[in-house]
Amino acid sequence: WNKFLQGYYDYSGISADSFDQAVQLNDQGKPVLTPAMKQQQIRLQTTVSPSVYYIGFNMLDPIVGGDSKRARDLRQAIAMTIDYEEYIALFMNGRGIAANSPIPPGIFGFQAGQAGINPTVYQWDGKQAQRRPLSAAQALMKQAGYVGGIDPATKKPLVIHYDVSSGGGADDKARFQWMRKQLAKLGIQLDIRSTQYNRFRDKVKTGQVQMFSWGWLADYPDPENF
């Protein structure tokens, strides 16, 4: 980014650390260049990345997996509780939207507005989607048998193992702490297991995970790629 500002490069992406220096949001919530960038005759080009990031569950796991109502209630409670709107604001400078389906904007089949919401996690207030309240997730936890997040088998907080691929940087640590706080709303204790990508991928493929974070960037712009 600094080399770009010095004129060495014709084009550059904007890192999270430099975002506020280069971009601000106008009254309509659209990204525009800051006055300092405009004075340097820099132009802003934006595009929608055909990518999705998600939390996955091992469906063979005895706690979070399977098609029993108990496991389904637990998964839905977790999905309701993780506030991705907050995550996008804190860690992505507002660049992104909370996913309601596997198909991202810009790909045929994506639906915006009321028709595209995930009714398990969101409700429509007449103008926009609103994440269901924490009380709804807590009610599902109770139905699943984890009142206040307590595991009836141990009489202690339910422990969920969360596998991620990480290089161990400061940004990753902040994200992990944020995720712990999300599940703590339900009384769940999150055990984060961070590994290098190759090891992480092998663990997912061989079912050595319980809950994990992954993503997908389209190889080509067609919904069947998702």
Model-derived segments and spans:
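Periplasmic binding protein-like
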Residues: Q28-V32, Y162, K181-F226
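Short, hydrophobic beta-strand segments
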Residues: I55-D61, K155-S166
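Immediate post-signal peptide segment of exported/extracytoplasmic ligand-binding proteins
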Residues: R72, L134-H161
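Extracellular/periplasmic solute-recognition and catalytic clefts
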Residues: W1-D61, E85, A89-F91, A98, ...
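Solvent-exposed, polar/charged alpha-helical surfaces in well-ordered, non-transmembrane soluble domains
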Residues: N2, Q6, I55, R72, ...
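Short helix-loop capping/hinge motifs at secondary-structure junctions, enriched
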Residues: D61-L74
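Structural transition elements
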Residues: V64-G65, I97-A144, S166-A174
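Sec-exported extracytoplasmic/periplasmic mature domains
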Residues: L5, Y9, Q24-D27, P62, ...
